């Protein structure tokens, strides 16, 4: 199984799939915000940034997937983004499932001073919604429950691929004649 993931990580198509799936999730989030009028909360914005980290890792791996160093850097970025996104989305889910006056998220995104995404790109990163409010459901699950599943899948997949990097692939036997 690990050799399958190792081989997969050396193919551009796998990295393109990671990149495009994360971009698709970003596009869906923007449709929910601008098309359906659902206001994103601070946690939603942080989850978007984590998805962008996964997209960046996919783009990085897409550049030169046969380089072990670049693959490891891309996997570390993607895995740390997926884990951070999972942690944020679980906290967000806790706010939705067990709302209380003393458990509220901030009304303002707290980005570093050197990277104020909410000021540079307010249409993408300016929060205006409530973290504890459930505004959309699909198949009985809220958007946050779906994003927890998505981040868990990204974390599992990227962890397996990262672990598989220590596995040596069998060298291809080149035969001149069959």
UniProtKB/Swiss-Prot annotation:
Q: What Pfam families does the entry give?
A: DsbB
Source domain of life is Bacteria
Q: Fetch the Gene3D superfamilies from UniProt.
A: DsbB-like
Chief location of this protein?
A: membrane
Cysteine disulfide partners in this protein: 41-44, 105-131
Of the GO CC terms on this record, one is: plasma membrane
UniProtKB keywords: Cell inner membrane, Cell membrane, Chaperone, Disulfide bond, Electron transport, Membrane, Oxidoreductase, Redox-active center, Transmembrane, Transmembrane helix, Transport
Q: Which residues form a coiled coil?
A: none
Q: Name one GO molecular function term.
A: electron transfer activity
- Give the SUPFAM superfamilies listed for this entry: DsbB-like
| Transmembrane annotation, as ranges | 15-31, 50-65, 73-90, 146-164
Q: Where in the cell?
A: Cell inner membrane
Provide the topology term for how it sits in the membrane.
Answer: Multi-pass membrane protein
Q: Name one GO biological process term.
A: protein folding
Cytoplasmic-side segments: 1-14, 66-72, 165-177
Which loops or segments lie on the Periplasmic side of the membrane, by the record?
Answer: 32-49, 91-145
Q: Describe the function of this protein.
A: Required for disulfide bond formation in some periplasmic proteins. Acts by oxidizing the DsbA protein.
Instruction: Give the record's family classification.
Output: Belongs to the DsbB family.
Q: Which NCBIfam families match?
A: PRK01749.1 (NF002485)
Name of the protein: Disulfide bond formation protein B
Instruction: Write down the species.
Output: Pasteurella multocida (strain Pm70)
């Amino acid at each position: 199984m690990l050799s399958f993931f190792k081989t997969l990580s050396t193919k551009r198509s796998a990295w393109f799939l990671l990149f495009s799936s994360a971009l698709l999730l970003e596009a869906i989030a923007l449709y929910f915000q601008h098309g359906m009028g659902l206001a994103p909360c601070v946690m939603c914005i942080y989850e978007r940034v984590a998805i962008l980290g996964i997209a960046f890792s996919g783009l990085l791996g897409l550049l030169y997937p046969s380089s072990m160093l670049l693959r490891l850097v891309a996997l570390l970025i993607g895995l740390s983004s997926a884990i951070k996104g999972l942690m944020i989305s679980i906290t967000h889910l806790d706010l939705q499932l067990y709302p209380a006056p003393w458990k509220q998220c901030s009304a303002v995104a707290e980005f570093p001073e050197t990277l104020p995404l909410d000021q540079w790109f307010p249409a993408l990163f300016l929060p205006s919604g409530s973290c504890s409010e459930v505004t959309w459901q699909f198949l009985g699950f809220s958007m946050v429950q779906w994003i927890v599943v998505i981040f868990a899948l990204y974390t599992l997949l990227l962890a397996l691929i990262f672990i598989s990097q220590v596995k040596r692939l069998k060298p291809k036997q080149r035969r001149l004649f069959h």
